[in-house]
Regions:
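Extended C-terminal regions of large enzymes
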Residues: 1-189
């Protein structure tokens, strides 16, 4: 199956094969375009764990397979718990960016250290969001509200500039300027 006019045909199930027991054996759909961008590259899964995207180190073939397993697992969590990839990916990336820039700390995140590419940190944050537990109660409100929460908590309005939103909604992975999409005005109004 594929989306209308899309040649990727990414809607099929696959079992995750990983050296990480958290992900190994999970059966899920393969990530679609939005998932690849928003809960894949946006979260640093295609980089060496803990490195920033700017440091860009090449991955080995085995590391690429693990990166894809992380993307598929994070997609599974979003699918399984009816979460939106676009808002979820933007929100989690915001938290990672704020942490990287030392604008928030592990203490602000109930002890979670959200370094780029760490699927265990993403798993822990998503579970807190799903249960609205601890900091997850604030993160569950979306990217803009997460930025507002940390800006107020840290008394730092500069935090708001890191929220990748337009009119309060997270920016998608697809190009919203495409006339084939038919939704370009939806992002502006």
């Amino acid at each position: 199956l594929s989306c209308p006019n899309c040649n990727l045909h990414c809607m099929f199930s696959s079992e995750i094969t990983s050296s990480d027991p958290l992900m190994n054996g999970v059966l899920s759909d393969m990530p679609d375009w939005e998932a690849l961008g928003m809960v894949g590259g946006n979260l640093g899964f295609m980089e060496k764990e803990g490195k920033t995207p700017e440091e860009g180190q090449k991955l080995t073939q085995a590391e690429r397979r693990e990166a894809l397993a992380k993307i598929q697992y994070t997609t599974f969590l979003h699918d399984n718990y009816s979460l939106d990839y676009i808002e979820g990916g933007n929100n989690l990336a915001l938290v990672q960016e704020l942490y990287q820039r030392k604008l928030i700390t592990e203490a602000d995140l109930d002890g979670i250290k959200p370094v780029w590419g760490d699927v265990h940190a993403i798993d822990a944050l998503l579970k807190k969001i799903i249960l609205r537990e601890g900091v997850g109660d604030h993160l569950a409100n979306g990217t803009l509200e997460t930025a507002k929460y940390f800006a107020q908590k840290k008394n730092n309005p500069e935090i708001l500039k890191y929220a990748g939103v337009t009119h309060g909604y997270g920016q998608p992975a697809h190009g919203v300027r495409s006339h084939a999409d038919g939704s370009d005005l939806e992002y502006l109004t």
